[in-house]
UniProtKB/Swiss-Prot annotation:
Coiled coil: none annotated. This is Bifunctional protein FolD. NADP(+) binds at G164, R165, S166, S189, T230. Pfam families: THF_DHG_CYH, THF_DHG_CYH_C. Pathway: One-carbon metabolism; tetrahydrofolate interconversion. Homodimer. GO terms for molecular function: methenyltetrahydrofolate cyclohydrolase activity; methylenetetrahydrofolate dehydrogenase (NADP+) activity. It comes from the Bacteria. It catalyses: (6R)-5,10-methylene-5,6,7,8-tetrahydrofolate + NADP(+) = (6R)-5,10-methenyltetrahydrofolate + NADPH; (6R)-5,10-methenyltetrahydrofolate + H2O = (6R)-10-formyltetrahydrofolate + H(+).
Length: 306
């Protein structure tokens, strides 16, 4: 059986490491502060924001959420961001994506002060990532690296294949792997013979947003498989096919009306991989944990205590 890379365990380790740093900041003057901007009432985004705010509360980080309506204009949202940039007690600003179509997302993300950009999306911080300079790293890619390192997975000299080229996951995780001396290939929808490329990977990262697309045929025996996907499958027939009619999984489907399935075939990965991240409970918990890491680090830099 392959080894499971347990994101919940690593998350708890990181939270334990953050607590004394947060206490030191509070003793120095004030705790770290995080502001989350959530536009409109997207149910999935609301869940993510609630989880972030709860984690802040658990750790002793000051947090607040700003919830403008989904009719907001780019200029109005820019004014909110600029106001948060100016507030001394706010160390981190997160603008929850996606934004409504009338809002210029790039302008909003560029308006966040690079020093308070705890998502790692500002061009200045992306440039620092490329140059391997200290700066906030995108949370999900940073979490993936923590899972690999704390899980004892060798990176240097390994062949890594990243399936997906998004600015949020694919590109930054490829760069982080490169900085750790892996040989990295990025694949996408136009990549020919994807299956054979994936089969060469010692570390395979799937971040494409398609449920169970990466089957066992894509996986090199013994490879480490990182599944970034979070796909809610509401088609019972499809869920049954993916889980090979597992009675336990189908009972869960009937209870909830859907199943959360990653980008990797959950049965095929068990048959082929040497280690893998489950969905849920793999990469997901680390995304919020690394947001907390970035917020605390920002507070330390701004307080001059790091």
């Amino acid at each position: 059986m392959p080894r499971i890379l347990d994101g919940n365990r690593v998350r708890d380790e990181i939270k334990g490491e953050l607590k004394p740093r947060i206490a030191a900041l509070a003793a120095h003057g004030r705790p770290p502060g995080l502001a989350v901007v959530l536009v409109g009432n997207n149910p999935a985004s609301e869940i993510y924001v609630r989880n972030k705010i709860k984690t802040c509360h658990d750790l002793g980080i000051y947090s607040e959420s700003i919830t403008p309506p989904d009719t907001i204009s780019t200029e109005e949202l820019l004014a909110i961001v600029q106001g948060l940039n100016a507030r001394a007690e706010i160390d981190g600003i997160l603008v929850q994506l996606p934004l409504p179509p009338q809002v210029d997302t790039k302008r909003i993300l560029m308006a966040v002060s690079p020093a308070k950009d705890v998502d790692g999306f500002h061009p200045c911080n992306v440039g620092a990532l490329v140059a391997n300079l200290p700066a906030p790293r995108a949370c999900t890619p940073a979490g993936i690296m923590e899972l690999l390192k704390r899980g004892g997975i060798p990176i240097a000299g390994q062949r890594a294949v990243v399936v997906g080229r998004s600015d949020i996951v694919g590109k930054p995780v490829a760069m982080l792997l490169l900085h750790e001396h892996a040989t990295v290939t990025i694949c996408h929808s136009k990549t020919p013979d994807l299956k054979s490329l994936c089969r060469e990977a010692d570390i395979l990262v799937a971040a494409i947003g398609r449920a169970a697309m990466i089957t066992g045929e894509f996986i090199k025996p013994g490879a480490t498989v990182i599944d970034v996907g979070t796909n809610h499958v509401a088609d019972r027939e499809k869920a049954a096919r993916i889980y090979r009619n597992s009675p336990e999984k189908m009972a869960n489907f009937d209870k909830r009306g859907n199943l959360l399935i990653g980008d990797v075939d959950p049965v095929g990965v068990v048959e082929k991989a040497g280690a893998y991240t489950p969905v849920p409970g793999g990469v997901g918990p680390l995304t919020i944990a690394m947001l907390m890491v970035n917020t605390v680090a920002s507070a330390e830099r701004r307080a001059g205590v790091c």
